[in-house]
């Protein structure tokens, strides 16, 4: 087996024009809007509500939501760029964005029924903050360690949990 250096010279991993534009836009936001309030928010455990209001003006809160629900989907590289630029300046804001996009919006878009999609996705695309909660006695927030299960009751009217919730 012989490896060719031609392959190395011909492979280019460059950002597209759209990806570069998103990087510059998010970098400008992160460097301008987030720094003045980071220490105060962190010290006082205050969520970045005002900063989020400014962030949604860019329309990036809907990147995991299909267009028919008001979103503006981007590729995975763009999503990574947004997270990278936010986390460079304010990791907690980046986590808030990740939860909104990945754990909330994307989960509903992929696994929600039509009623859930119509109810939640337009609101999330418009800027309402998405959230996610997971806790179990003995497992905390470690999803892999969860043992609690929900089973539909025999009459189909409710679910029965077989463990403890915190």
Residue ranges and their predicted role:
Residues 33-34, 111, 128:
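A generic secondary-structure signal for well-formed alpha-helical elements
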Residues 95-115, 140-142, 155:
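N-terminal glycine-rich flavin-associated loop
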Residues 68, 101, 137:
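Flexible loop residues that form catalytic
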Residues 71-72, 115-166:
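Glycine-rich, Trp-frequent "lid" loop and neighboring beta-strands that shape
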Residues 75-78, 107, 144-145:
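Short secondary-structure transition/capping segments
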Residues 2-98, 115-119, 123:
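Amphipathic, small/basic residue-rich leader segments at the start of a protein or domain
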């Amino acid at each position: 087996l012989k490896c060719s250096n031609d392959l190395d010279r011909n492979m280019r991993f460059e950002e597209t024009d759209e990806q570069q534009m998103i990087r510059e836009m998010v970098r400008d936001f992160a460097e301008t809007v987030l720094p003045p309030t980071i220490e105060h928010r962190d010290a006082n455990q205050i969520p970045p509500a005002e900063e989020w209001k400014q962030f949604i003006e860019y329309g990036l809160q809907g990147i995991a939501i299909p267009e028919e629900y008001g979103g503006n989907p981007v590729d995975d590289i763009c999503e990574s760029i947004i997270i990278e630029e936010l986390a460079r300046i304010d990791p907690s804001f980046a986590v808030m964005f990740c939860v909104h996009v990945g754990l909330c919006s994307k989960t509903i878009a992929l696994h929600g029924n039509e009623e859930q999609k119509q109810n939640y996705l337009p609101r999330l695309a418009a800027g309402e903050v998405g959230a996610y909660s997971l806790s179990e006695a003995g497992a905390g927030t470690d999803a892999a360690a969860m043992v609690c299960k929900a089973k539909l009751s025999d009459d189909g009217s409710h679910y029965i949990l077989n463990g403890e919730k915190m």
